[in-house]
């Protein structure tokens, strides 16, 4: 899809799904996990980890104390996590608004929703319908507005 939409054939999958964000934090801060900082985990603020613009974006990556994981994890449920996440996302949005606005402009300029639908349509008859439908749902979710 990225080759079709963006003309980019150089996107590679992170083998651990977190090695690149860890290296990015280390490069930007000079701090190494389990050497300079302990009991923290590298997390994606808004998720969208299958979207290359979000996966490596410094404004979507943070170090979170492991103690806070019950409040920040995507599987967290309940009133306390909901309240914490509301405050956390509001603060993150206020810090990174210019970058998020750039992203919003980009997905509008590229008309990502229609690009995804056209790409999936181009594969109809060559791929299993069930697989295409799941891919379309996942891609639309990954490329949606924040």
Where are these regions (language model features)?
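C-terminal, well-folded lobe of enzymatic/effector domains
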Residues: 105-146
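Polybasic, low-complexity binding patches
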Residues: 54-55, 71-115
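Short leucine-rich amphipathic alpha-helical surface patches
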Residues: 68-69, 100, 123, 127
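Short, charged surface segments at domain edges that flank catalytic/cofactor-binding sites
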Residues: 1-32
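Histidine-centered nuclease catalytic patch
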Residues: 23-63, 69-77
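Short, structured coil/loop segments at alpha-helix boundaries
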Residues: 51, 65, 81-85, 125-133, ...
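Generic structural signal of hydrophobic/aromatic residues within well-ordered alpha-helices
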Residues: 2, 21-28, 84-85, 116-119, ...
């Amino acid at each position: 899809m990225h080759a079709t939409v963006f003309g980019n054939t150089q996107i590679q999958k992170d083998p651990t799904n977190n090695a690149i964000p860890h290296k990015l934090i280390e490069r930007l801060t000079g701090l190494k996990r389990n050497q300079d900082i302990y009991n923290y985990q590298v997390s994606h603020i808004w998720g969208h980890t299958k979207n290359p613009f979000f996966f490596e974006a410094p404004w979507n990556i943070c170090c979170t104390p492991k103690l806070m994981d019950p409040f920040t994890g995507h599987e967290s449920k309940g009133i306390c996590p909901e309240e914490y996440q509301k405050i956390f996302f509001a603060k993150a949005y206020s810090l990174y608004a210019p970058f998020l606005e750039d992203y919003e402009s980009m997905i509008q300029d590229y008309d990502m929703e229609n690009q995804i639908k056209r790409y999936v349509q181009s594969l109809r008859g060559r791929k299993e319908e069930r697989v295409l439908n799941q891919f379309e749902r996942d891609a639309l979710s990954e490329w949606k507005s924040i």
